[in-house]
Amino acid sequence: MVAFMNSATFVAGLFTLWSRPIWATPASNTNAVVVNGTAFTLNGDHVSYRFHVDDATGDLFSDHFGPRVSGNFPTEIVSQVNGWVNTIGRVRREFPDQGRGDFRIPAIRIRQTAGYTVSELLYRSHTVIPGKPALPGLPATFGSEEDVTTLVVHLYDEISEVAADLSYSIFPKYDAVVRSVNVTNQGAGNITIETLASLSVDFPYEDLDMVYLRGDWAREAHSERRKVEYGTQGFDSSAGYSSHLHNPFLAIMNPATTESQGETWGFSLVYSGSFAVNVERGSQGFTRALLGLNPGQLSWVLRPGESLVSPECVAVYSADGIGGMSRLLHRLYRNHLIKSKFAVSDRPVLLNSWEGLGFNYNETTVYQLATEAAELGVKLFVLDDGWFGDKYPRTADNAGLGDWVPNPDRFPHGLPHEVDRITALHPGNDTSTNLRFGLWFEPEMVNPNSSLYHQHPDWALHAGSYPRTLTRNQLVLNMALPEVQDYVIKSVSDILDSADISYVKWDNNRGIHETPSPSTDHQYMLGMYRVFDNLTTKYPNVLWEGCASGGGRFDPGVLQYFPQIWTSDDTDALERITIQMGTSLAYPPSAMGAHLSAVPNQQTGRTLPITFRAHVAMMGGSFGLELNPAHMPDDERDAVPGLIALAERVNPIVLTGDMYRLSPHDSQWPAVLFISPDGEQAVLFYFQTSPRVDNSIPRVKMQGLDPQAVYSVDGDAEYSGATLMNVGLQFPFDSDVGSKVVFFQRL
């Protein structure tokens, strides 16, 4: 342990040109974390993350987050103007607390019993841990001692008696640093955590751009790029879930960075509740980026001895542009975030009943739809909303939520009987396999027209006597209550135990409005994570899919438990290109649910060719159908078995391969290439989205291939990787809207 002076002696150490060595050896589990005195370096294969303790005060100052470095490292020289004393407001800080002259956004703000919000969290000690400890009650990345090493830096405020343990886990193979903080009240009185960021990064003086995802229902994940201006800018969710409006993801890059070239930093918060992302360029030109819990939904009281652990935030660095950043996140999440056995397993082609039947069905029509699905070669039949409710049957969206018992009017012989009939069907008349059965749930919600609400109105979130506002005729259950968590676990378990159910679609169709306190949002998510963990552990052979009116909760927190998420309720293929490519900035395509739907499309009214619709959906890890085959034209119905076979051929590459966005979503010719992990196979998805008269045919240039290797293109022509990447190929289209799926095989 090192003793440090108090803040009164800060200035003396602030102007010291401080230099200590960084050892330049390949990153591994033995040198991923290098400690030299009180200078700390985390090394990935291509990245270094470095900070040090100020000798005079014990404050943590940031040095470098970027390309891997070695040797002696100079820290910032802080300017002095007209004799004025410099403060920590002029330096790059690692975990900025409130007060003491730093007027930028803090990573932590604590209100003490006396009302003070000043903190002085200074270095006390550090610990290096092989591997990575779990975060109590929260989703988190994981790995063995060979995969990851963790540095914990222990800070302490002697006046308030508050401790903060900063956790840094380095995954060298993925150039990823994962950060979180654990705050403990070691004093005698209560304190209130008003702000807590999982990660704060101060970038050096330079111009930067930022990219983020915005949207709304049915138009999620639209990417936006803008210059980082002086002052503050940012986005958040206050809806109690990550939401359609913004995603807990941020990318920072140099203005010259493109999809394939240039420095890019990616930040992804492993959390599903209300969050905040703030970016501030200060007067000195430094840019500070913070991601964490939303301060407006926090006010977390810590009694003596209690702790608050932040969600973790993943930070990656790539010199290979925005695409390089995305591929690092994809690989990390596939291998070290998603716990499900289905993370990289081939997904069954499914048919979901919602757009085909809606609420209008009974056991006869359900069986008929399942039979038609099996005849087409579908492997999994999913019965969506409407199957439950006894006294308050779910025949529309205004009743039944909360009463998770099968509707006896729809299923007079019982739901297990219906499941048995459906799972006796054979996909494509292949008697060696049986059709699987899945079911839709929305367990976090309750209708006022339900037995549950009449028995437990207090279980619905509310704020005293204020009106309980409805969305889609429903209220939100208070998942912070252990009795509500236990009810949900038992209700879902009873259904899964009653029949051969191999898939669950878990929906969430509204945000949180009224709560008894700001901290309820985070308490809700902790309760929700307990439910997710319990059920997915109890039923590991069930394929779980997340949903929140589409992609309203498409975030890393959900991916810990559910390997796939319904990307959007918008199934229009042209719209989906934008939504899926935007989602892929942070999330692996393996996690995306994407379906071929009927035309005219229910959301846009647009009619597109069936091959185009199917090819767009194949770019998601979970390909399915969202229609009623009985209503399809004969030529489209006849095409479905071949499209399913194609989807099953590309699915292993989409699930496990690297994704290259060759041409942007707003191009007339969007293009995406997937390359298998061994580099032996690749598949190109290429689209024409609008007609051109007498226009030259563009070339699409591949990326990520071996320039020295030779590849066959659809088993025909052969070209070198260098030719495919530098010259490219032309693909003519014979209609105004068209698509191609092209296979490459390394010879």
UniProtKB/Swiss-Prot annotation:
The reaction(s) this protein catalyses: Hydrolysis of terminal, non-reducing alpha-D-galactose residues in alpha-D-galactosides, including galactose oligosaccharides, galactomannans and galactolipids
Keyword annotations from UniProtKB, A to Z: Carbohydrate metabolism, Glycoprotein, Glycosidase, Hydrolase, Magnesium, NAD, Polysaccharide degradation, Secreted, Signal
GO biological process: polysaccharide catabolic process
Glycosylation site residues: N36, N182, N190, N362, N429, N449, N534
Enzyme class: hydrolase
GO cellular component terms listed in the entry, alphabetical order: extracellular region
List of catalytic residues: D507, D569
InterPro entries linked to this entry: Aldolase_TIM, Alpga-gal_N_sf, Alpha-glycosidase_related, Glyco_hydro_36, Glyco_hydro_36_C, Glyco_hydro_36_N, Glyco_hydro_b, Glycoside_hydrolase_SF
Primary subcellular site in the record, as a coarse category: secreted
EC assignment: 3.2.1.22
Localization in the cell: Secreted
Domain of life from the UniProt record: Eukaryota
Cofactors (names): Mg(2+); NAD(+)
Pfam families named among the record's database cross-references: Glyco_hydro_36C, Glyco_hydro_36N, Melibiase
SUPFAM superfamilies for this protein: (Trans)glycosidases
Signal peptide (from-to): 1-24
PANTHER family on file: ALPHA-GALACTOSIDASE C-RELATED (PTHR43053:SF3), GLYCOSIDASE FAMILY 31 (PTHR43053)
Function: Hydrolyzes a variety of simple alpha-D-galactoside as well as more complex molecules such as oligosaccharides and polysaccharides.
Family named by the database record: Belongs to the glycosyl hydrolase 36 family.
Oligomer status and interactors: Homotetramer.
Name of the protein in its database record: Probable alpha-galactosidase C
Species name: Aspergillus terreus (strain NIH 2624 / FGSC A1156)
Taxon lineage: Eukaryota, Fungi, Dikarya, Ascomycota, Pezizomycotina
